[in-house]
Amino acid sequence: MRNILVIEDSPLVLKILEHLFRQEPDLEPIFCASLAEAEVMLDTSSDLFFAAIVDLHLPDAPNGESVDLVMRYHLPCIVLSGSYNEQRRDELLMKGVVDYVLKESQHSYEYAFRLLHRLDHNSHIKILIADDSDAQRHYIRHILEPHHYQIIEARDGKETLRQLNEHPDLDLLVLDHSMPGVSGFELVKLLRQKLRLNDLIIIGVSADPKGSLSAQFIKHGADDFLRKPFCPEELNCRVMSTLERRDLLRALKKAAEYDALTGLRNRRAFYEQGMQILQQAQRDSRHISVAMLDLDHFKQINDGFGHASGDSALVVFARALSSFFPDMLLGRLGGEEFALLTLHGADHVNQALEKLRQHCAGLHYAVGAPPLSFSAGLYHGEPEDLESLLHEADIRLYRAKQQGRARTVLA
């Protein structure tokens, strides 16, 4: 839960904000209607707050004193204003507020909440600023720091590559076109040969007046482009939109590859990843182990205790499976059927399956339900096509069920 300080006196604006907060269970607003109230609140409880939404003009703070108050406590500050003043906006942004939002429409207030959500995520976001100009790097850092990003700097192409190697988890690169040693184009081409589009966001920047430069940057693999000089809001909007787009693509990819109930790979993703493991085994002349697992008497669990209990059994089993086989390829192929693929030997896998079986017997998944058990078929052999390997494991799974369930058949 994140506590948000809201300093606002307008009944209409408060009504809108209260409505939006009701849709955000992770955000808890604490309202103050005046500068005096806010001073008391921050003086006694400033450590409770994650960020603040602040009206620029209050009856007892007509000149933005409420913003200055919040900034003194180093809280991320989103400013609301009923009128637009470009000079005032620039002053506030250079002072370090998160953003300056006009009270224009529902969309404006929703944008303020997007900022709150990004602030909550941004502490995990790493951004590399690559520019040979000290002044330009400091300017970009000053713009981005109020949003709680982790900022790293590089002054030339060589240092940029070094920072990328030292920080493989970098999320975004702000890259100047004209740097000593290697151009922005060359760096983008080099990085895209190693990294997929969703692994690193690249925003090119340049003071070059050529109109084709932005298109060339994007054709080389950049995600976006900014022409210098740019205003703080433009950079922040580009950074936020590219990060949100990446998050959406990752969520779509996860939904396409992972089973929504258990969190394991689905059949398609299991096959795709399995083919890569097979190719590795073929290159290294290694054998491969594959197992098919099936929950015992699953239909009886569904019929006798309800489908919610059946779902609970699947989730509990999937968690246990992931815990006992953390470095192996796992998947839910459908219903109560699971699969496992690894380069480990059959004895290693068989021993782990027996430990998993003992562990599952003590797991609780529904009141009054029988102990959780599973049957497994395990095959170890040459890395032929995946379908044949799974078929061999499935034959052994069938034998395990014929022999009374709750066992693994290998031979």
List where the protein language model places each region:
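Catalytic/regulatory signature loops of cyclic-dinucleotide turnover enzymes
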Residues: E392-A411
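Catalytic strand-loop-helix junctions within cyclic-nucleotide turnover domains
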Residues: L341-V349, F374-E392, R396
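Conserved nucleotide-binding and Mg2+-coordinating catalytic segments in signaling enzymes
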Residues: K253-E272, L293-H307, V315
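A short pre-motif secondary-structure segment
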Residues: L329-R332
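Active-site residues of response regulator receiver
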Residues: I53-D55, L175-D176, S206
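Short regulatory alpha-helical coupling segments
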Residues: K253-K254, R267-H287, A318-F325
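Acidic catalytic/metal-coordinating carboxylates
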Residues: S34, A61-E65, D156, S183-L187
